[in-house]
């Protein structure tokens, strides 16, 4: 899992860089195919890529994002591990959470989907209606984004 996190983090994906967001979704799909045995669907929502793995009509949605707030080059080095802490753009928000969810989906065959957008850091401007639409049809939507200081 740590190697997958390193790969996702090193592929910097600031929201405003659409090609980088496409690239990170493609990498997430490669990881999903290897870990889960089947590829994700790469959907387009208002011109932006969205990762969708799992049921087409899920009762439970695990919602994530793979864009980052950091412009490319904000971290030097881009990836760093010191003791038990990993650092880099998107480690905390929210590439690690995405990977935890992806690995947790192993063995789930129906009723759930892992969905990752690429515009969350700018307020989900292009995916907000899509998120509302898919959420309205689900029984539960879980977001595994980390919080500061143990806040919920």
Where are these regions (language model features)?
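Acidic/His- and Gly-rich active-site-bordering loop/insert found
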Residues: 1-91, 118
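Acidic/histidine-rich catalytic neighborhood of metal-dependent amide-processing enzymes
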Residues: 94-152
């Amino acid at each position: 899992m740590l190697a997958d996190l390193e790969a996702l983090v090193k592929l910097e994906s600031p929201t405003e860089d659409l090609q980088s967001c496409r690239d990170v979704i493609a990498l997430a799909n490669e990881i999903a195919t290897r870990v889960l045995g089947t590829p994700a669907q790469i959907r387009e929502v208002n011109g932006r890529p969205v990762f969708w793995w799992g049921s087409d009509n899920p009762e439970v949605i695990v919602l994530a994002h793979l864009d980052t707030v950091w412009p490319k080059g904000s971290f030097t080095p881009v990836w760093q591990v010191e003791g038990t802490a990993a650092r880099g753009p998107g480690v905390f928000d929210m590439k690690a959470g995405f990977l935890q969810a992806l690995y947790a989906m192993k063995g789930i065959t129906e009723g759930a989907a892992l969905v990752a957008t690429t515009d969350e850091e700018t307020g989900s401007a292009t995916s907000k209606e899509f998120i509302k639409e898919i959420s309205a049809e689900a029984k539960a939507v879980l977001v595994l984004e980390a919080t500061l200081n143990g806040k919920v």
